[in-house]
Structures are given as structure tokens and as C-alpha cells.
A protein has these predicted regions:
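PLP-dependent class I/II
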Residues: 1-282
Length: 282
């Protein structure tokens, strides 16, 4: 069970391993909220093996409260499921949202698998260093077999990654403040565009928005091939690849607010102008 929209590689990983994704549907106008026990349990069948989530979310920026996290772990324990929690964006929460990890709970650890990485936390994507964490010995024994079939991460990358963990909390506070400013800019500008649906995300550095266009991927190609303003255009990720359900997300986009403030302002102005001109001709 995976709340959709979700990180597209989950689909690749799960299906390659012989699994089947049962998508948990969400809505843009509800901020892609999925932490509803009744809806989650309605997805569970005798074949269900796991619930997989990203918290904070990619591509939605959705954050779980501590109570919502506890509810998900309760469901996993009561139905004897794995709860796979991808926490690579854990430090990136805003608006006073406290930082939580599923590893803090003193029960259900046999059901829990945590995924973490240096790539987002320290902006060190090139290092390709991450980890699986679980107290389930059977699971870890099987994970070790996979690890032993691969060569190790480069030694220098491991040394550098270990050093990154000596970074103090002031680093993350500065990064959070900068991402919050960028998020606020993008959300403010999106809310100025008629017909756009976008709830303010509370974490990570992504957001999803529904646009007043017939097809976001077609719109994206038009922006790249036929649209420009003073030599500039704008690019984003079309929403449909973030869904397992055919036809969903066709008018949605993901925006990563990782540019400088002035570049984000310009990008959102280009998006607004592009939507207006596209709808005049389509």
C-alpha cells in the first residue's frame, strides 16, 4: 500500500521484486492527506505485505504528526505488516513542525523498516550513500544477502559521509529557513494564478499543484518547444508518472523549490504567463 502520488522509483523497485502497488488515493484540494485509518485499512487484503510511505513526502511535501505516525505503526502491528518509512527528508519541516522518526516508538520495531540517506540531508546526492534500519533480524539477514552481492560504496565517499554527521544543528536551521522562504514564495505565486490548486506543504522541498490545463505533460512540451518570454521558459515534472492509477495526475505538476529566490519568482511568473497563453490556443 503506497499513498499516491509517490516517488516514481518505488514503482520500479516494487514491481521488479514481484510486488504489486495498491495505491492509496489522495486529492490535491486536501493537501494529499492520506493518514486516515479507515481508508488505509480498506486497502488491506490477505495479500498485503507492507505499507510504504515517505515522511516528509516526495512529491507532495506532506508531513505526518506524531499521532498519525503512531496510527500507521498501530495498523502495521495489528495487521502484521511491514511499515517501510522513507525518512530522507526528516530534517526539512517548517512552520514549527517538530522532527519525528518512526524509530522513536518503543513498540512495533519488528514491523518497521527505516530508509535514510545523506543525499538530501546534506545535499550530497553524488555520494550515493544510504541505509536500511530495522530490528527485524530476518529482514536484515535477507538485506545483507543483497548487500553482499554488490561492491561497496567508494571508501572516500564513506569517509566524507561520516564527517558530515558532525555538522551542528545550526546548519539545518539555516537550511530550513531558506527552504521555507522559497516555499512561501512559490505557494504565494501559485495562489495568484487563477484555477491553480495548491495546498501549502509542511516539509521536504517539493510541492504538487493542479493546473487549469488539459494535460500537464503536453503543456510542459509546449513550454519547452513553443513558449518563451525574453528568451526564458520554465520546466517542471509532470504529475502523471507519480501515480500508479492510470489517468490520475494528468493535470498536476511537481515543483522542486531548490532555486534561488529571484529565480523562483521568475519561474512562477513564466508559469502564469504560460498557462494563460496555452489556454488561449488549446
Amino acid at each position: 500500500i503506497v499513498p499516491e502520488p509517490f516517488y516514481p522509483n518505488y514503482h520500479t523497485f516494487i514491481t521488479t521484486a514481484g510486488g504489486v502497488i495498491h495505491p492509496l488515493h489522495t486529492k490535491p484540494e486536501e493537501g494529499y492527506f492520506y493518514a486516515d485509518r479507515a481508508r488505509i485499512e480498506a486497502c488491506i487484503t490477505p495479500k498485503t505485505k507492507a505499507i510504504m510511505i515517505t515522511n516528509p513526502g516526495n512529491p507532495t511535501g506532506t508531513c505526518l504528526t506524531e499521532e498519525q505516525m503512531k496510527m500507521l505503526l498501530d495498523v502495521a502491528v495489528e495487521h502484521d505488516l511491514y511499515l517501510v518509512a522513507d525518512e530522507v527528508y526528516r530534517e526539512f519541516t517548517y512552520d514549527g513542525e517538530p522532527l519525528h522518526s518512526f524509530g522513536k516508538f518503543d513498540y512495533g520495531q519488528e514491523n518497521l523498516i527505516l530508509i535514510d540517506s545523506v543525499s538530501k540531508r546534506f545535499s550530497a546526492c553524488g555520494a550515493r550513500i544510504g541505509c536500511l534500519i530495522s530490528r527485524n533480524r530476518d529482514f536484515m539477514a535477507n538485506a545483507l544477502k543483497y548487500c553482499q552481492a554488490r561492491l561497496s560504496v567508494a571508501t572516500l565517499d564513506q569517509i566524507a559521509a561520516a564527517a558530515l554527521y558532525s555538522v551542528g544543528p545550526e546548519y539545518f536551521e539555516q537550511v530550513r529557513q531558506e527552504y521555507k522562504r522559497r516555499r512561501d514564495t512559490v505557494v504565494r505565486k501559485l495562489h495568484e494564478i487563477p484555477g491553480v490548486i495548491c495546498e501549502c506543504p509542511r516539509g521536504a522541498f517539493y510541492l504538487m499543484a493542479a493546473l487549469p490545463v488539459d494535460d500537464a505533460e503536453k503543456f510542459q512540451l509546449w513550454l519547452l518547444q513553443e513558449f518563451e518570454d525574453h528568451g526564458d521558459t520554465v520546466m517542471f515534472s509532470a504529475g502523471e508518472p507519480f501515480y500508479a492509477t492510470p489517468g490520475k495526475g494528468c493535470n498536476e505538476i511537481r515543483i522542486a523549490y531548490v532555486l534561488k529566490q529571484e529565480d523562483l519568482e521568475r519561474a512562477m511568473d513564466l508559469l502564469a504567463l504560460g498557462i494563460r497563453k496555452y489556454n488561449e490556443t488549446h
